[in-house]
């Protein structure tokens, strides 16, 4: 396994928190720590009239969030390499901190072609 990739959809979130760049910076930093990841850099941008995008560069890969306060929605992407981190923990913290009433989480393992080749069974001809 190369790593784990989590895609999180957050619905019915706290509109004010989704538009608060400082809050999101703190929350992203905490989420990275909760996942057991090492934060290398964090870039955020607040859009006018609303919305924030945040991108955390992790030693293990990345965490990103894009918010639409007017819809109470946030799109989150967490990818971590190796098996020592827990991206689901970052997702759970973000869900709680943004007050999402509903969410959808998709999680899957990233594999190298060699690992996939050994996992795929070809039927005998």
Swiss-Prot record:
The active site is at 61 (schiff-base intermediate with substrate), 66 (proton acceptor), 81 (proton donor). One of its GO terms (cellular component) is cytosol. One of its GO terms (molecular function) is adenosylmethionine decarboxylase activity. Is synthesized initially as an inactive proenzyme. Formation of the active enzyme involves a self-maturation process in which the active site pyruvoyl group is generated from an internal serine residue via an autocatalytic post-translational modification. Two non-identical subunits are generated from the proenzyme in this reaction, and the pyruvate is formed at the N-terminus of the alpha chain, which is derived from the carboxyl end of the proenzyme. GO terms for biological process: spermidine biosynthetic process. The keyword Membrane does not apply. It catalyses: S-adenosyl-L-methionine + H(+) = S-adenosyl 3-(methylsulfanyl)propylamine + CO2. The record marks 60-61 as: Cleavage (non-hydrolytic). It comes from the Bacteria. Binds 1 pyruvoyl group covalently per subunit. Pathway: Amine and polyamine biosynthesis; S-adenosylmethioninamine biosynthesis; S-adenosylmethioninamine from S-adenosyl-L-methionine: step 1/1. Its cofactor is pyruvate. The modification Pyruvic acid (Ser) is found at residue 61. Keywords: Autocatalytic cleavage, Decarboxylase, Lyase, Polyamine biosynthesis, Pyruvate, S-adenosyl-L-methionine, Schiff base, Spermidine biosynthesis, Zymogen. It holds the Pfam family AdoMet_dc. SUPFAM superfamilies: S-adenosylmethionine decarboxylase. The keyword Transcription does not apply. Catalyzes the decarboxylation of S-adenosylmethionine to S-adenosylmethioninamine (dcAdoMet), the propylamine donor required for the synthesis of the polyamines spermine and spermidine from the diamine putrescine. Heterotetramer of two alpha and two beta chains arranged as a dimer of alpha/beta heterodimers. This is S-adenosylmethionine decarboxylase proenzyme. It comes from Prochlorococcus marinus (strain MIT 9313). The lineage of its organism: Bacteria, Bacillati, Cyanobacteriota, Cyanophyceae, Synechococcales.
